[in-house]
């Protein structure tokens, strides 16, 4: 007979991810996601202005920091999604960070 999968809440905590080092809560993740648009726009503003070493250095620093933030947002959403792929909230988080990533790479394709 097939075993029925347990709900995440039924699992021993030692077998559950602690994602709080990345984001304290889903609400904290949402706030970081909302702030991402302004950061993408600020990095996209470098388009056509990479003509000297100082500006290029600033651009590289800004894109490196932005990529770190996107990676953290993505990892959190992906792991929340992987906890239970049936959950609509996690599916939404995963879809939205993927959409933001597309926005980022589009903005940086100059």
Region spans (language model):
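N-terminal helix-rich structural modules
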Residues: 1-110
């Amino acid at each position: 007979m097939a075993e029925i999968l347990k709900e995440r809440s039924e699992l021993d905590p030692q077998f559950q991810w602690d994602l709080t080092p990345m984001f304290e809560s889903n609400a904290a993740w949402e706030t970081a996601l909302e702030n991402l648009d302004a950061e993408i726009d600020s990095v996209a503003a470098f388009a056509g202005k990479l003509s000297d070493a100082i500006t290029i250095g600033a651009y590289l620093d800004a894109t490196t920091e932005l990529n770190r933030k996107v990676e953290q947002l993505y990892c959190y959403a992906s792991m929340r999604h992987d906890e239970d792929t049936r959950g609509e909230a996690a599916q939404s988080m995963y879809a939205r960070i993927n959409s933001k990533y597309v926005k980022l790479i589009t903005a940086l394709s100059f």
